[in-house]
Amino acid sequence: MNLKEIHYGIEIETVKRTREQIAWAIHSVVGGTVRHVGIPSSYDPWEVEDLRGRVWKVVGDASLTSVPAHLRAEVVSPVLGYDDIPQLQEVVRAIRRAGGKINSQCGIHIHIDAAPFDGRHLGNLAKIIYKQEPLILHALGISRDRLNRYTRPVSDELIQRIEQHRPRTKDQLNRIWYGYH
């Protein structure tokens, strides 16, 4: 498996700027068109369709309670690949230049395409994360409140079930993890 062929998406939470300001910051890097696609009373979504037809979304995030609702934004990238890393870095820099900030409530979520992996690979990944999780959480300075609410650690029970059943397929892992396929 070539790691450079894996696709991913990322969600980045930011505060101190409106979703419109964040959308225009993204546009300054990716080009294309910016449009307001929602109503302010919901997630107030904005979209930036880049020059390649991919859509970057900027939505509200109710978990960022330390700032007024209009200054909470979550950037949702399109599906990206290895070659998009430099552009993603430029998007983050543009958001920072526009005044977007992070605070202790902000987080990121990285979604990795599971297609190249089977149940054995993903089970092993879960076990590696589980073993290194205390170090990762300490290095990132994750607050106890966030751990209790949003960033839940991998459970002992899940790892025990993975070790007991040793899944070979994603369907088997889904049944272990979620209790169904």
Each language-model region and where it sits:
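C-terminal accessory/tail domains of diverse enzymes
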Residues: 1-102, 115-181
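Short, conserved phosphate-binding/catalytic loop or strand-edge motifs used
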Residues: 104-108, 112
